[in-house]
From Swiss-Prot:
The protein's name in its UniProt record: Protein FAM151A
Gene: FAM151A
Domain of life the protein comes from: Eukaryota
Taxonomic classification: Eukaryota, Metazoa, Chordata, Craniata, Vertebrata
Family per record: Belongs to the menorin family.
A Pfam family this chain is assigned to: Menorin
Membrane topology: Single-pass membrane protein
Location (main, coarse): membrane
Keywords assigned: Membrane, Transmembrane, Transmembrane helix
GO cellular component terms given for this protein: extracellular exosome; extracellular space; membrane
PANTHER family: MENORIN (DENDRITIC BRANCHING PROTEIN), PROTEIN FAM151A
Transmembrane segments: 14-34
Subcellular location: Membrane
Amino acid sequence: MVCREQLSKNQVKWVFAGITCVSVVVIAAIVLAITLRRPGCELEACSPDADMLDYLLSLGQISRRDALEVTWYHAANSKKAMTAALNSNITVLEADVNVEGLGTANETGVPIMAHPPTIYSDNTLEQWLDAVLGSSQKGIKLDFKNIKAVGPSLDLLRQLTEEGKVRRPIWINADILKGPNMLISTEVNATQFLALVQEKYPKATLSPGWTTFYMSTSPNRTYTQAMVEKMHELVGGVPQRVTFPVRSSMVRAAWPHFSWLLSQSERYSLTLWQAASDPMSVEDLLYVRDNTAVHQVYYDIFEPLLSQFKQLALNATRKPMYYTGGSLIPLLQLPGDDGLNVEWLVPDVQGSGKTATMTLPDTEGMILLNTGLEGTVAENPVPIVHTPSGNILTLESCLQQLATHPGHWGIHLQIAEPAALRPSLALLARLSSLGLLHWPVWVGAKISHGSFSVPGHVAGRELLTAVAEVFPHVTVAPGWPEEVLGSGYREQLLTDMLELCQGLWQPVSFQMQAMLLGHSTAGAIGRLLASSPRATVTVEHNPAGGDYASVRTALLAARAVDRTRVYYRLPQGYHKDLLAHVGRN
């Protein structure tokens, strides 16, 4: 009996001991979770390679994924500046990293917080990170001015990250390419910089830029296509998010190149920055804002311009200014949205001659203008628009009337006769130079080239040459002549079209007939889309070719290839039927 009582007491002790151990483990786990997961911050958003917007949104420091809500503190280098930055309501700290005593006998190799030519500081990078990581939740952007500072700094970041102390996005910046107006090379070595990041601290956001110079008393050049393409060549293959710092005073003139750059990868964004002495136009900032998704561009701009820009940018009644060579995003299609939501509309015309007026459907979308020519090339030709009613309106009058209509529009010029191509492009160029063309513009035609050479159609080379020479800021929309499509879109037809369009920097939307997709080479749409990040496909159908039921399967198959990059140029009734079918399923 005594033995049993003793055994029972021992069991009770072990039970209590077990409960105590489990409780300690649970409490430790909770404490660890709270430590790693600061209030409001989602774990994925708190990693060094996280999206800055996701991080700030998790903390409640911004209200939506809009990069305009992010605020910046410049040159938080000295302890005094760092303390002021930490006590501010700024969301991201920007600081410069150099090497102590760089280029002197006193060079130590220690990373310090200083902007060249300063090579000494009361703040080392280690001290700076200790203060910022320990007392704030602010995002971090480190600007490296010399390659010698990069390796030791990344080693320190890696150590702190492994210790669990870096729970926020880290941006690693360096100017790695020679940019506008630079007479000498002062950039950080691109190859070494990128290699060090991949080797020592790959879980970060890259911020590679161009060295620039601006002088108000002399002519200033802007970023060139070659500069932008070289940058993409350098970083296109890296796995990180990439945000390109761009001098805001130079961005508008180079927008065709940056529009191209942003379209090359969903990992890309821009950070517009302003030097204190730079003249800056709020209209230029609004132009960039209008032509990008709100998460694609950060604005590191000084006051009072920043507040003025924000007020105008968020004004829903302001009339936006769209780049004619841009995509339909965000004007007619939200990022990631279904291309089926973009509708093609055909205007009608009442009257004739100078008194003719144009009417549009109530909905918004792409305005299809079948364009021909009045008169001969030798007689001062006038581009005209053919309408379903048979009435004719000049293209210039049509575009000017459209400019007065409220709403969101894109323009799709379908060149019906070869002689109308260059006069139509010349008109677009003139209206654009006058500031009267504020929508995305597509210029398309059924073209003759290679295995689909057919007399009477616009020559494929001529379409591309005319666009390049007369008005390059458009989306090119080539299609195949019906005469060669008896067996559908065969392999050689696809190959010749892709070879023709290879290397274009403009967006391309290949025009395909729905009735023929079922008879075509397997994967035809996918192959066209794979040719470029900017490539799209527009599936069209004429009611004379059959009712909706006859093309429904082909339309749904096209949509299954890519919901976001396939558009549908259909009669309004067919478009509604397709929307209804997709909605039911």
